[in-house]
């Protein structure tokens, strides 16, 4: 919005040309989201407390968590407001990628909000059923995947429609342009054509998987938000590179026109995330809830698909992956041993993985900071793929 206003007035006020610089708007988007979060945070927390939107704590979990009972949840609303307002202020409204990422983010946020609302307001411990939640995640994920399959390689929505019609006329056999191929990090000559259906399936898995993985990681004070900020910021760097004809050519990446504008969204996400951490640091004054975790995970997955860095997201989000795999292994092993031996056995003291380390003697703050450090290392490895190819 501010970009359009500045472009309209810049002939009379030359200093407004600074709005044409993506990096300037990215910095301002981050600062705006940070100020919104810090400014409205106390009000949101106070309001959630008045509404008695308190988090229930499992009695069979780490005993140190019992003191958290009643801490207001659904604080992810604060993050989403900061991201949405800042992005709409500083991003180019004509950019189609901004709108699809906002759609996924706010759509998944709505799913999480309904789930949280049922849990804490209606006192329904189950919230949304797994089937209902998965259904709506699938609807949004498939819509985004189908659009991006024809959008990533094109420069406008008209070209998206033309490519779609070409695919239909070809009997659904048309291969997508090379820009839509799966990029293998560290190898500049290797990429895999996916086809329309392959692209849609992979995109769906990345978006839905990332959303749920981030949600599983959100279990300790400050644990999930810093990895989200770090990974999101790194994806912003990739977006800037892929959106630049000069940098993408120099670093041997496909040029994706319009992808650079996602740096605005990533910067807003970083600012909003740091503001939330101010209140979520141990001992937390507010929890994120599904409304924030599902949304942020969906955003990371969508951005990774647009900038063709699905595998790099898997690397940088290694903590999210480890948390998810620990749950899958725990459930699978428990069911297998119960069927085989008549009693369920566990691989970990408790899943997700962060609870295993807590029950192994690590303090909550140790788990959180060590997971942050691991994420920093993985993000640096991911960023190194920009040049080490």
From Swiss-Prot:
Membrane topology: Multi-pass membrane protein
Main location: membrane
Entry keyword Repressor: no
TM spans (from-to): 25-45, 74-94, 97-117, 134-154, 190-210, 222-242, 259-279, 286-306, 311-331, 366-386
Catalytic activity: UDP-N-acetyl-alpha-D-muramoyl-L-alanyl-gamma-D-glutamyl-meso-2,6-diaminopimeloyl-D-alanyl-D-alanine + di-trans,octa-cis-undecaprenyl phosphate = di-trans,octa-cis-undecaprenyl diphospho-N-acetyl-alpha-D-muramoyl-L-alanyl-D-glutamyl-meso-2,6-diaminopimeloyl-D-alanyl-D-alanine + UMP
Uppermost EC category: transferase
Entry EC no(s): 2.7.8.13
Cofactor(s) listed: Mg(2+)
GO biological process, one term: peptidoglycan biosynthetic process
Molecular function, one GO term: metal ion binding
Pathway in which this enzyme or protein is active: Cell wall biogenesis; peptidoglycan biosynthesis
Family as reported in the entry's similarity comment: Belongs to the glycosyltransferase 4 family. MraY subfamily.
Described function: Catalyzes the initial step of the lipid cycle reactions in the biosynthesis of the cell wall peptidoglycan: transfers peptidoglycan precursor phospho-MurNAc-pentapeptide from UDP-MurNAc-pentapeptide onto the lipid carrier undecaprenyl phosphate, yielding undecaprenyl-pyrophosphoryl-MurNAc-pentapeptide, known as lipid I.
Protein name in UniProt: Phospho-N-acetylmuramoyl-pentapeptide-transferase
Organism of provenance: Ralstonia pickettii (strain 12J)
Lineage: Bacteria, Pseudomonadati, Pseudomonadota, Betaproteobacteria, Burkholderiales
């Amino acid at each position: 919005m501010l970009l359009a206003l500045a472009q309209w007035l810049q002939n009379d006020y030359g200093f407004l040309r600074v709005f044409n610089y993506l990096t300037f708007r990215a910095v301002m988007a981050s600062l705006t989201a940070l100020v919104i979060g810090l400014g409205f945070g106390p009000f949101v927390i106070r309001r959630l407390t008045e509404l008695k939107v308190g988090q229930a704590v499992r009695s069979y979990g780490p005993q140190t968590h019992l003191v958290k009972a009643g801490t207001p949840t659904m604080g992810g609303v604060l993050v989403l407001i900061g991201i949405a307002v800042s992005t709409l202020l500083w991003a180019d409204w004509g950019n189609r990628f901004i709108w699809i990422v906002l759609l996924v983010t706010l759509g998944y946020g709505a799913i999480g909000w309904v789930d949280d609302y049922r849990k804490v307001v209606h006192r329904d411990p189950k919230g949304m059923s797994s089937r209902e939640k998965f259904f709506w995640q699938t609807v949004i994920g498939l819509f985004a995947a189908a659009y991006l399959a024809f959008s990533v390689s094109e420069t406008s929505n008209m070209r998206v429609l033309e490519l779609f019609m070409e695919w239909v006329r070809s009997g659904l056999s048309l291969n997508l342009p090379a820009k839509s191929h799966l990029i293998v990090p560290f190898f500049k000559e290797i990429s895999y054509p996916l086809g329309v259906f392959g692209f849609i399936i992979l995109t769906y898995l990345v978006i839905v998987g990332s959303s749920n993985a981030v949600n599983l990681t959100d279990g300790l004070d400050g644990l999930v938000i810093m990895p989200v900020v770090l990974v999101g910021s790194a994806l912003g760097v990739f977006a800037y590179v892929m959106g630049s004809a000069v940098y993408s050519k120099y670093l041997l990446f496909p040029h994706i026109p319009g992808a650079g504008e996602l740096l605005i969204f990533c910067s807003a996400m970083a600012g909003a995330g740091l503001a939330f951490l101010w209140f979520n640091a141990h001992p937390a004054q507010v929890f994120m809830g599904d409304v924030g975790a599902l949304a942020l995970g969906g955003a990371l997955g969508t951005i990774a698909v647009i900038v063709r860095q699905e595998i790099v997201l898997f690397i940088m989000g290694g903590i999210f992956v480890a948390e998810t795999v620990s749950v899958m292994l725990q459930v699978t092993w428990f069911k297998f041993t119960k069927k085989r031996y008549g009693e369920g056995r566990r691989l970990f003291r408790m899943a997700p993985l962060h609870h295993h380390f807590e029950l192994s003697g690590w303090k909550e703050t140790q788990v959180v900071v060590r997971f942050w450090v691991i994420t920093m290392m993985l993000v640096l490895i991911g960023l190194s793929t920009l040049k080490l190819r």
